[in-house]
Design a protein with these regions (language model features):
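Regulatory extensions appended to serine/threonine kinase catalytic cores
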Residues: 447-554
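Conserved short submotifs of the Hanks-type protein kinase catalytic core
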Residues: 261-277
Length: 808
């Protein structure tokens, strides 16, 4: 039988370049891949086979979840040996069965968008993966027709390898149909068994017609199983036309009669994928788990492959660590036995513990695949609870139960959304989950490395505004004008700084709305009214999403104008019909802040954070809302909880992105409130020198260094505070702080401290007389620029009080 065309040797461009998607992902019907980064897809390769879908539907009125072997398609012998990378060049010799050697590879491959180094996988001879005694464990023997247990141990002895099902009378035979040396279809020389999957044995073979390359033959457990034949046909028809580097290649489909059987069995011929499965990696690491960043990076490689299937109207259906293979330079899905058309009915193959709970009701869906992504990610990193039957319990531990999730709170939120019991609350597409996984990975790396890992948001506009910058340093303005100021964050500043959600550039309404959203809010509202009138008059066709997108744009404009009532009216009307759109929650949260209901705003932002856990805008909003609650409520219900929440979220944002300076000042405020002044100074020192707020950060650091009780201030604190001010340009606040620093030094000496090495502060000798003279001259300099005449007199009086005694 002729071979199908194979995937190109060169890796395809990343499928998600320059694309983002918020809505539910549906099978694409265009002639190009959804991201248009690859060549045209043959029409026969992208349209689900209607005959096959009808066959699935004819099998059963409702889907029935069927058990798959836990070791399915894992290449089980990898538990004893690491296996070789698959593809090699035809020039070198690696022994019988393959005349190819590994291609030249980069010495280090990085995953996760280049952020995570791929672990080294040692290449070995593929023949080492062949099972010496291929046998299906009794606990994994089920009737191919009725799914009843068969071949089990009884009081008379071990279970039978072959026989008849007692429940339905169907024959079963768990012996491998092919033996070593057997030539299948005159082309594929069998080397032995690799593993047993849910649809039969998996064999290693050598393709004698194509450079003696290694291939895998996947056979059916029972040739009489029509349903299994249909599933195999699905692989051949759907997948042989596709070529994606993250999915095992289908080379051929052949039939072969062997083992004295009269009926020819079908075999799918696939590329041999060596390396280690993630299941094998877990076994080697036990009882430890795969590091968090590495586990996330693996799933980031898998999600584009899943999305590739989804774009063709297919669901993978059985994602788990066993089915993800890591070779020396790639991560690949290796088992296609459960692939089925989206929303098709019939037998559904999957693995308990990883399979979505609703799949028997809905059939294969994108949401079900993403559920298994979340479960797989959790299984790689966490020791998940196990049920009596040995399957993973369908729960995600809480941060209180799992320290790892306390360390990475964004990761916990991502796992919870991916595995939501309600599929409507999960990520709407593989791309949407990928975007959030990238953000969570950057948060994880920021925690682990202590370095920021910023990225451009896929969902929010840039955070351009700031709030709370002057909250601490602004208190020193009392020195120059005599006005008392409370260290409070301004609500209007917070709202102005929070970014607006972006409209999806691929949304049907984007082309119509994007030109209208430039300008001030009044212009935006006027443009929206004129556009709505043109649509009503039939001049312009109404995009299907215009009602939602237009209302959101109008709500944003009303919020910018401070018209909370009108904004909330629009949002309340949208909410019942678009309950899963987090942008409504975001706008409601901002409106609640403007309305002074900070607790309600916090709840809205918390919902948004759970839906887009990889974004930094929601934790920034949560931190601000918690701080606003603390400073505006006379008797907060739980001030410690609010303080901790504000600190945690400010820390998350600042640790991840040092461009969001509001988070640095917010974290410094919370640390200062805890009395951790030196830690607050350390945070402010991280504000980049290129930031327009660098000078204020340095001033605030100087203020905090001398704000502790006099007995706790050290000589180094005074020297550092003075050095900061010396390096800054002169402005009124620098002069104010000089007064404060010199005054602190005066009190430090008065308390009995003696300088060890410090000779001068801000040019004044570190003696009682020298510092008093310095304080006097600084106060007189302030008096010259004081805006209020009466306060100017007070400054002069104070200067006279501190000047050293003299005879003139």
């Amino acid at each position: 039988m002729p071979e199908h065309s194979e995937a190109p040797d060169q890796p395809l461009p990343h499928p998600w370049a320059n694309r983002r998607m918020r809505g539910s992902e549906m099978p694409r019907r265009s002639t190009t891949h959804p991201w248009a980064t690859r060549g045209p897809v043959p029409p026969e390769g992208r349209i689900p086979n209607p005959v096959l879908s009808e066959r699935f539907s004819a099998q059963r009125a409702r889907p029935v979840a069927r058990r798959r072997d836990e070791a399915e398609f894992e290449l089980e012998l990898l538990a004893e040996s690491d296996s070789a990378a698959v593809e090699s060049d035809p020039e070198a010799d690696t022994g019988r069965g393959s005349g190819r050697s590994a291609r030249s590879r980069p010495s280090v491959r990085k995953l996760g968008g280049g952020l995570v180094e791929m672990p080294k996988v040692t290449p070995l001879d593929p023949r080492a993966a062949v099972l010496t005694d291929p046998e299906v464990h009794e606990i994994k023997r089920f009737c191919w027709k009725c799914d009843a247990p068969v071949g089990r141990r009884t009081t008379d002895g071990p279970g039978e390898i072959s026989g008849t099902c007692a429940a339905c009378g169907s024959p079963f035979n768990f012996r491998p149909a092919l033996g070593p040396g057997e030539l299948v279809a005159g082309q594929y020389e069998v080397q032995g068994c690799l593993a047993h999957g849910g649809l039969g044995w998996v064999y290693l073979a050598v393709d004698r017609n194509v450079s003696d390359r290694w291939v895998v033959l996947k056979g059916l457990q029972n040739p009489l199983d029509f349903e299994a034949h249909v599933v195999a046909l699905a692989e051949r028809q759907f997948l042989s036309e596709m070529a994606y580097p993250g999915i095992v290649k289908i080379h051929n489909f052949v039939k072969h009669a062997s083992g004295g059987r009269d009926i020819a069995a079908g075999y799918i011929v696939m590329e041999y994928v060596g390396g280690r499965s993630l299941k094998k990696m877990l076994d080697v690491l036990a009882p430890q788990r795969i590091p968090v960043a590495e586990a996330i990076a693996y799933l980031m490689e898998v999600l584009p492959a899943l999305d590739y299937l989804h774009s063709f109207g297919l669901a993978y259906n059985d994602l788990k660590p066993d089915n993800i293979m890591v070779s020396e330079d790639e991560v690949k899905l290796i088992d296609l036995g459960a692939v089925a058309a989206l929303d098709s009915y019939g037998s559904i193959y999957g693995t308990p513990g990883y399979q979505a709970p609703e799949i028997t009701e809905t059939g294969p869906t994108v949401a079900a695949d993403l559920y298994s992504v979340g479960r797989t990610l959790a299984a790689l990193m966490l020791e998940l609870p196990v049920e009596r039957d040995g399957n993973l319990a369908p729960v995600i531990p809480s941060p209180e139960q799992e320290p790892l999730l306390r360390r990475y709170p964004g990761l916990h939120r991502l796992l919870c959304r991916a595995t939501e019991p309600d599929p409507r609350r999960r990520f709407p597409s593989a791309y949407a989950m990928y975007c959030q996984l990238v953000g969570v990975l950057r948060m994880v790396l920021a925690v682990d490395s202590g370095r920021e890992h910023p990225q451009a948001s896929a969902e929010f506009a840039s955070i351009l505004g700031d709030f709370g910058i002057d909250t601490l340093i602004g208190q020193t303005d009392r020195v120059i004008d005599g006005t008392q100021r409370m260290p409070m964050v301004d609500v209007a500043d917070v709202v102005a700084a929070l970014p607006a959600p972006l409209i999806d550039t691929e949304d049907p309404s984007a082309e119509l709305l994007l030109p209208l959203l430039r300008g001030d809010p009044h212009q935006v509202l006027d443009a929206l009214r004129r556009t709505s009138a043109r649509i009503a008059a039939g001049v312009v066709a109404e995009p299907e999403s215009f009602e939602l997108e237009g209302a959101l744009a109008a709500a944003q404009a009303h919020i910018e104008l401070g018209d909370v009532v009108q904004a909330r009216a629009l949002l309340d009307e949208l909410a019942p019909r678009h309950a899963d759109d987090w942008r409504i929650e975001w706008h409601l949260g901002v409106a609640a802040l403007l309305d002074g209901d900070f607790e309600l705003g916090y709840r809205h932002f918390d919902t948004v954070h759970s839906m887009v856990p990889g974004e930094i805008a929601p934790p920034l909003a949560l931190a601000a809302a918690a701080e606003l609650m603390l400073q505006h409520l006379d008797e907060p219900g739980d001030p410690d909880r609010l303080h901790d929440a504000a600190m945690e979220h400010y820390r998350t944002v600042w640790r991840t992105n040092h461009g969001v300076v509001s988070a640095a000042f917010g974290l410094a405020r919370r640390l200062a409130a805890d009395g951790e002044l030196l830690e607050a100074v350390a945070v402010l020192d991280e504000v980049p020198a290129a930031s327009r707020h660098h000078a204020i950060a340095q001033m605030t650091g100087s203020l905090l260094l001398v704000s502790r009780p006099t007995a706790e201030i050290t000589e180094r604190d005074l020297d550092t505070a003075a050095a900061r001010l010396t390096a800054l340009p002169d402005d009124p606040r620098t002069l104010q702080l000089k007064v404060i620093v010199v005054g602190a030094a005066v009190e430090w000496l008065r308390a009995g401290a003696q300088p060890a090495r410090l000779q001068s502060i801000l040019g004044f000798p570190v003696t009682a007389t020298g510092l008093r003279q310095g304080l006097e001259s600084s106060l007189r300099a302030l008096a010259q620029i004081a805006p209020d005449r009466w306060h100017r007199y007070r400054l002069i009086d104070l200067a006279n009080q501190v000047r050293p005694r003299s005879w003139w």
